Swiss-Prot record:
One of its GO terms (molecular function) is DNA binding. This is DNA-directed RNA polymerase subunit beta'. It catalyses: RNA(n) + a ribonucleoside 5'-triphosphate = RNA(n+1) + diphosphate. The keyword Metal-binding applies. Mg(2+) binds at D450, D452, D454. Binds 1 Mg(2+) ion per subunit. DNA-dependent RNA polymerase catalyzes the transcription of DNA into RNA using the four ribonucleoside triphosphates as substrates. It comes from Streptococcus thermophilus (strain ATCC BAA-250 / LMG 18311).
Length: 1212
């Protein structure tokens, strides 16, 4: 068996007849499977033990040789080799076909490879192969043309006319095989290359396609005649099994039926040929054999599929590979694993960040081998069998052992759907009673889990290395930041937020106000004894908190704060200032001076002069977490998060917030606002009836009126709300609900959308507290139903988008430290009209500069070249008034099959520079795909208002961008740089004409009459700039501008969609995906290279092909860049394994086999498929080739290091 981790590449070619014979262990001559009485395989049948190996380990068929000691002996009675039964999964047989048969993939695929090789139409091929016509193979002296078709009648007439044997014409695959043998590849290729020099149009296109196929055969060493089969391989029997069901019936794989048909027809054909049957009968039998082999290889590709019982089409070999249930996606890319379990999850509020609760019953089953080993080691049992019995009986002693075994042994928890890498994290197991897994509440957000019946899977990493990786790389406490935007993903929610909000509230005149305490303990004791309220403002000696970073002038003073804030600050690391207010200055700099008593000042006077501070809300807690992470990194942050969680839960319980109907306020002037709106609507309708406005204008005015009425109610609600109202507290703290929910409870529900997406003019005037009328209830159900269907459709769409994104970028890995590129990317803030979509500061953070950044006024260098920009540097650059910066970018990186560290920058998930080996392509795909479900589905229906086209937004727009489709509502772009000199309206054709005067000439552009113009007369325009509103077609932009312009445009467009929905994604993720779409070029003129015109190839391969030619002084090839959609780009990848496992499996494999393609196993998927360790992370060659040192070597090195240090210090 080949060691899978040793081989470098994998090649696929056409199998020659000799190759098939060399695979085979014997010919299958009979269609029988197994004997119905003995249930033993029949001799020379499809399950024969002589050919395929024994059905039982180390046992021949007749039972003469049993046991392993006869290994390798071939039984003299039954002829079966004594070996392992699993050889029945790898040993193949063969069938000697009595007539050649064409392979349907090469004849029926698009384009037909046989047709292109022979320069015959697929229709003509079909007629010949299925015995409807003769083809002339050798016209000899006759005027017939080679490869011309003759019907039965014409054939007889020509024979009479020219005499027997005067020419050769045949039918069936045999004829095609003869023609294929006659093809002289070298001569044909030379002829086609000549033809290409002059050919144009359709003729050129056809010649390029033919040349491509012939060249593939020539270079790969495959012979064209191998597309016709003379010998058919038979799949090993355990890959097409027959299993006995209860009740004595058998379930067999469909392949057995398909093979049986082939064998039956082949045997019948042999008999007919022996008997010398009439030609027409033999022909019919050959045709049936051809159809049987077609069905076996790809049932249903031609004609009606062969069906089994209940008219179900049989699954052929091709179907075994295709689709989600096929071999690639079902068994090779992901497998079911042992040492795993799944259960319902419940909340574990007492757990630490790195722990999870595992039920005892699950743990004993999952860790069974470890427990058994320990039982034997402790000599509770003599052998493994006895130990197993102990575990299964549930002996008391096993629980102590289990406790010891799971110590320090992390487990992985996974929740489906795993949308991003935080969907699998490692935890240390804690044994619990019950049957549900316990999950830490803070990791719920990363998993998108809740406790309404969600289930999770648990996996045990077995090897030492796997455990080490789980502990160091996957531990939940390490995953504080989200890889998509570098923001904390473990922010407290709901009860935790509410508890901390309640704790940090301030109130006037509560008991104990103005008391002064000497230290924290005294303050807390006073609170517990009821002398002071949690929200009362009191004083505390600054000196009692010596660890905090006080300013010089604040020492030895009294700080005015509340008991709640004292408790809140007691859990915050001492490096962070004392948090007295929610401002950024307090968090990053120091506690403001106004909260400190000057000597001799009265505390009550100071308290009265201070405003009431807002409590800490969800977003403030998020800022605190981010700041702590920035300063103290992972370990301290996760410890703090646990303290925050415990505090939040405790005070949430103490606060005891409840909600009743009385807590929903009543707005005093609601009726007035609604009456005023009714009056306004009546006026609008009157104006419309008088003909003063159009229907569209009236509709807009009415809906706007109702929107304004709803907003007025909302505003009134906010003005009159009581900050201690439980609903207000929940909403304000960010624990649950938002202003829109609140206004539907207490204000009015407002306008609803009709089923067609158009907003209905009749609003719902009631709110939920008053209750809805029947009609209002009916109106509001449209939206609810549409919401449900949208969500369901969106989930599937978003999942498929993620899959395509992963596929196109899975081989993008950080390959080297620095690619040494001399290009950079100039970036500025991304704007949409006047609005800023993404600020320059956000775009700069975590990138390397290309050139140094200078102050625009003073000229001093703010950041040097090739420096990693930190948050502070980014802020300094923007504050200096710099508007554009040249940075290192993925777009300009020269690394092959990946990116270098400097062009990528920071790893957003860790906050440090990215490591070599990071699989940034997969991370990028997940970061873009995971928020896909949050995007809207809708194309906006404005009811024919405002714009001439519906604007595509949300998920459909993202798909449009990544698939490089022509956008809806396309903008007209200019091809010349110059000035707009005239915009002419033509009422007759309902168009406008825009004239742009450039240096080289005049550009004239026809624009639809209804399109909204972006330019006016006198405006300066650049090539590729949009003249009208709408989306630019990227392929068109590529023709007018360069690759970088297209890349920058696509990046900005993706960001616009996500940011408009409030989703933040790092630029670099989009850059990785967009770069993959522009990796290919199309060869225009091959020059002196041996490239073929019209070929799609990787930029790096193209450059390599040109390099040698340029050095030797030849004419280099020319090419033009091509923008491919992600699906197309995935299928065009150099790895055929990756492409075949993605989509269009048969087409990819057909093409790869003809070309004799080699897969160099560069990406992740191809390595997973063959079971090799993936070349990313710790699987990279540079990390795998490290030799561990022996202990004594380590000591030697340490001693040397110590000696060197001593020498250095003495030199100092």
């Amino acid at each position: 068996m080949v060691d899978v981790n040793r081989f470098k590449s994998m090649q696929i070619t056409l199998a020659s007849p000799t190759k098939v014979r060399s695979w085979s262990y014997g010919e299958v001559k009979k269609p029988e499977t197994i004997n119905y009485r003995t249930l033993k395989p029949e001799r020379e049948g499809l399950f024969d033990e002589v050919i395929f190996g024994p059905t039982k380990d180390w046992e021949c068929a007749c039972g003469k040789y049993k046991r392993i000691r006869y290994k390798g002996i071939v039984c003299d009675r039954c002829g079966v080799e004594v070996t392992r039964a699993k050889v029945r999964r790898e040993r193949m047989g063969h069938i000697e076909l009595k007539a050649p048969v064409s392979h349907i993939w090469y004849f029926k695929g698009i384009p037909s490879r046989m047709g292109l090789t022979l320069d015959m139409s697929p229709r003509a091929l079909e007629e010949v192969i299925y015995f409807a016509a003769y083809v002339v193979i050798d016209p000899k002296e006759t005027p017939l043309e080679r490869k011309s078709l003759l019907t039965e009648r014409e054939y007889r007439e020509k024979l009479q006319e020219y005499g027997q044997g005067s020419f050769v014409a045949k039918m069936g695959a045999e004829a095609i095989q003869d023609l294929l043998k006659q093809v002289d590849l070298e001569a044909e290729i030379a002829e086609l290359k000549e033809e290409l020099k002059t050919a144009t149009g359709q003729k050129r296109f056809k010649a390029v396609r033919r040349l491509d196929v012939l060249d593939a055969f020539y270079k790969s060493g495959n012979k064209p005649e191998w597309m016709v089969l003379n010998i058919l391989p038979v799949l090993p029997p355990d890959l097409r099994p027959m299993v006995q069901l209860d009740g004595g019936r058998f379930a067999a794989s469909d392949l057995n039926d398909l093979y049986r048909r082939v064998i039956n027809r082949n045997n019948r054909l042999a008999r007919l040929l022996e008997l010398g049957a009439p030609g027409i009968i033999v022909q019919n039998e050959k045709r049936m054999l051809q159809e049987a082999v077609d069905a076996l290889i790809d049932n249903g590709r031609r004609g009606r599929p062969i069906t089994g019982p209940g008219s179900r089409p049989l699954k052929s070999l091709s179907h075994m590979l295709k689709g989600k249930q096929g071999r690639f996606r079902q068994n090779l890319l992901g497998k079911r694993v042992d040492f795993s379990g799944r259960s319902v999850i419940a909340v574990g509020p007492t757990l630490k960040m790195y722990q999870c609760g595992v039920p005892r019953l699950m743990a004993i089953e999952l860790f069974k081998p470890f427990v058994m080993r320990e039982i034997v080691a402790r000599e509770y049992a003599g052998n493994v069998k006895a130990a197993k019995r102990m575990v299964e009986r549930g002996d008391e002693r096993i629980w102590d052992i289990l406790e010891d075994v799971i110590k320090e042994h992390p487990v992985l928890l996974n929740r489906a759907p795993t949308l991003h890498r935080l969907g699998i994290q490692a935890f240390e197991p804690v044994l619990i009673d019950g049957k549900a897994l316990r999950l830490h509440p803070l990791v719920c957000e990363a998993y998108n889990a809740d406790f309404d019946g969600d289930q999770m899977a648990i996996h045990v990493p077995l090897s030492e290395e796997a455990q080490a990786e789980a502990r160091l790389l996957l531990l939940a406490a390490e995953h504080i930041l989200n890889p998509k935007d570098g923001k904390p993903v473990v922010t407290p929610s709901q009860d935790m937020v509410l508890g901390n909000y309640y704790l940090t509230m301030e109130d006037e005149g509560r008991e104990g106000e103005g008391m002064i305490f000497k230290d924290i303990d005294e303050a807390v004791m006073a609170y517990h004894n009821g002398y002071v309220h949690l929200h009362s403002r009191v004083g505390i000696a600054v000196d009692s908190m010596p660890d905090k970073p006080w300013k010089e002038n604040q020492l030895h003073k009294i700080l005015v704060t509340t008991v709640g804030k004292i408790l809140f600050n007691s859990i915050i690391p001492s490096e962070i200032p004392y948090l007295q207010e929610t401002t950024n200055e307090n968090l990053t700099d120091s506690t403001p001076d106004k909260y400190f008593l000057e000597p001799g000042q009265d505390i009550q006077t100071v308290i009265d002069s201070l405003e009431i501070n807002a409590p800490f809300k969800k977003k403030h807690l998020g800022n605190i977490i981010a700041e702590i992470f920035k300063r103290l990194r992972t370990t301290e942050t996760s410890a703090f998060l646990d303290r925050l969680k415990d505090l939040g839960y405790y005070y949430s319980t103490l606060a005891g917030l409840t909600v009743g109907i009385a807590d929903i306020p009543v707005i005093d002037n609601k009726q007035e606002i609604i009456d005023a709106a009714h009056h306004r609507v009546e006026e609008i309708n009157k104006a419309f009836r008088r003909g003063l406005m159009t229907e569209d204008d009236r509709y807009v005015a009415v809906t706007t009126t109702w929107r304004e009425a709803k907003d007025a109610l909302e505003k009134r609600l906010i003005e009159t709300q009581d900050p201690k109202n439980p609903i207000v507290m929940m909403m304000d703290s960010g624990a649950r609900g938002n202003i829109s929910n609140f206004s539907q409870l207490a204000g009015m529900r407002g306008l609803m959308a009709a089923p067609n997406g158009r907003i209905m003019e009749l609003p719902i005037l009631s709110n939920f507290r008053e209750g809805l009328s029947v009609l209002e209830m009916f109106f509001s159900t449209h939206g609810a139903r549409k919401g449900m269907t949208d969500t369901a459709l969106k989930t599937a769409d978003s999942g498929y988008l993620t899959r395509r994104l992963v596929d196109v970028a899975q081989d993008v890995i950080i390959r080297e430290d620095d690619c040494g590129t001399d290009r950079g990317l100039v970036i500025r803030a991304i704007t949409d009209g006047k609005e800023v979509t993404e600020t320059l500061e956000e775009r700069l953070f975590g990138r390397y500069t290309k050139k140094s950044v200078k102050h625009p006024e003073t000229g001093e260098v703010i950041v040097g070249p090739d420096t990693l920009i930190t948050e502070d540097m980014a802020a300094a650059i923007v504050n200096a008034g710099v508007e554009e910066v040249t940075i290192r970018s993925v777009f300009t990186c020269k690394t092959r099959h990946g990116v270098c560290r400097h062009c990528y920058g920071i790893n957003l998930a860790t906050g440090d520079a990215v490591e070599v080996g990071e699989a940034v392509g997969t991370i990028a795909a997940q970061s873009i795909g995971e928020p896909g479900t949050q995007l809207t589905m809708r194309t906006f229906h404005t009811g024919g208002v405002a714009s001439n086209t519906d604007i595509t937004q949300g998920l459909p727009r993202i798909q449009e961008i990544f698939e490089a489709r022509n956008p809806k509502g396309e903008a007209v772009i200019t091809e010349v740089k110059g000035t707009v000199i005239e915009i002419e309206e033509d009422a007759a054709t309902r168009t406008k004409k825009v004239f742009v005067q450039g240096k080289t000439g005049m550009g004239e552009y026809v624009v639809p009459f209804t399109a909204r113009m972006k330019v006016e007369v006198g405006d300066e325009v650049h090539r590729g700039e949009a003249l009208t509103e709408g989306s630019i077609q990227p392929k068109r932009l590529l023709e007018v501008r360069d690759t970088l312009s297209v890349e920058t445009y696509l990046l900005a467009e993706v960001q616009k969609v996500y940011r408009s929905q409030g989703v933040e994604i790092g630029d670099k993720h989009v850059e990785v995906m967009v770069r993959q779409m522009l990796r290919k070029v199309r060869v225009m003129d091959p020059g002196d290279t041996d490239l073929l015109p019209g070929t799609l190839m990787d930029i790096s391969d193209f450059t390599d092909a040109n390099k040698d030619i340029v050095i030797s002084g030849g004419v280099p090839a020319t090419s033009r860049p091509v923008l491919l959609g992600i699906t197309k780009a995935s299928l065009e990848t150099n790895s055929f394994l990756s492409a075949a496992s993605f989509q269009e499996t048969t087409r990819v494999l057909t093409d790869a086999a003809i070309r004799g393609k080699k897969d160099h196993l560069i990406g992740l998927k191809e390595n997973v498929i063959i079971g090799k360790i993936i070349p990313a992370g710790t699987g990279m060659a540079r990390y795998r080739n490290i030799e561990p040192l022996a202990v004594n070597e380590v000591e030697v090195i340490e001693n040397i290091a110590v000696d060197e240090a001593i020498v250095e210090s003495s030199e100092d």
